[in-house]
């Protein structure tokens, strides 16, 4: 768990730093000036590695110092690199040009990706959206084989295939490289009731793929994708998990447009898309995808998609 954030930045890279430090304080995460490169390491001890009263494995470093970042990576410390050049930044789990769009959620995801921990994306009353791990693949494939799943993933995911091999590679690379993707949907009630040894139950997935096949609009365009295990249909869970994903997209991904493709025979899927705020992209609202009739819907304002139900 991320508990401490060190930072060492030149003045020209400190834009947005004060706002980030305030948010860290609100979240109860300790902020520590890293100071001189040598002094940063002088108090290191043997396992558990520590820096003063700080356990190094609970820390993340923000720096524009390439050598410090490389040393941090070698020592097992997650690092967010700040650089306005395209050069290689060894040791950094993530590299950004500045801190202006950085928030605590992004730091937590950077920390999790460095340590190979599935990051929690959002948490609601009943559900948790969390990055998928390889250990989730078997359960997710079983859900994909349930009756009624032939309408799931009309777009790019259906073309890519839904196999254990594809999903395991996806878990290893997608979140680290892109910062978004298809997330696991976990039911919290299963943990409370002791159904699955104190763990939340994986009941589906929900998230985004790049909407590269759409040409209209500018900026980041994503396609909403989801799949829900059949026993959990008609309980409002599909609506809840999609709203959680859309809210995340609006707040953290700075999305310009979100699309959704719904099979023309999937009346329930169309009703859910409409309830979420999606509308037909053209007068007919129909297109063809690999010879299958689909309804293509879009809404260019993510805020409109997360309105409270009337």
Predicted feature residues:
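Charged, low-complexity surface patches
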Residues: 10-13, 61, 221, 238, ...
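Generic recognition of short, well-ordered alpha-helical segments
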Residues: 15-19, 74, 219, 237-240, ...
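GNAT-family acyltransferases
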Residues: 5-7, 19-30, 94-231, 244-248, ...
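Conserved active-site alpha-helix within GNAT-family acetyltransferase domains
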Residues: 70, 239, 264-282
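Asp-based, Mg2+/Mn2+-dependent phosphohydrolase catalytic module
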Residues: 1-60, 64-127
């Amino acid at each position: 768990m991320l508990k401490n954030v060190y930072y060492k930045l030149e003045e020209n890279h400190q834009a947005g730093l004060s706002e980030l430090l305030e948010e860290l304080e609100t979240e109860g995460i300790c902020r520590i000036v890293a100071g001189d490169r040598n002094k940063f390491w002088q108090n290191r001890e043997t396992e558990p590695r520590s820096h003063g009263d700080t356990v190094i494995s609970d820390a993340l470093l923000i720096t524009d110092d390439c050598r410090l970042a490389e040393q941090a990576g070698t020592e097992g410390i997650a690092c967010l690199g700040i650089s306005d050049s395209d050069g290689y930044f060894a040791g950094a789990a993530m590299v950004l040009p500045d801190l202006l769009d950085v928030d605590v959620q992004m730091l937590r995801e950077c920390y999790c990706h460095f340590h190979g921990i599935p990051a929690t994306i959002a948490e609601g009353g009943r559900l948790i959206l969390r990055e998928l791990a390889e250990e989730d693949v078997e359960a997710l494939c079983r859900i994909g084989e349930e009756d009624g799943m032939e309408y799931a993933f009309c777009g790019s995911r259906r073309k890519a295939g839904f196999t254990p091999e594809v999903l395991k590679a996806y878990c290893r690379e997608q979140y680290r490289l892109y910062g978004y993707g298809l997330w696991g949907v976990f039911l919290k009630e299963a943990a409370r009731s002791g159904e699955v040894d104190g763990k939340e139950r994986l009941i589906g997935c929900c998230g985004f793929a790049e909407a590269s096949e759409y040409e209209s609009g500018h900026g980041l365009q994503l396609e909403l994708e989801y799949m829900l295990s059949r026993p959990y249909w008609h309980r409002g869970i599909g609506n809840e998990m999609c709203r959680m994903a859309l809210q995340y997209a609006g707040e953290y991904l700075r999305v310009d447009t979100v699309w959704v493709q719904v099979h023309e025979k999937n009346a329930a899927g169309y009703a859910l898309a409409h309830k979420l705020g999606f509308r037909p992209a053209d007068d007919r609202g129909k297109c063809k995808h690999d010879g299958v009739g689909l309804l293509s819907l879009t809404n260019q304002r993510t805020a409109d998609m997360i309105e409270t139900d009337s």
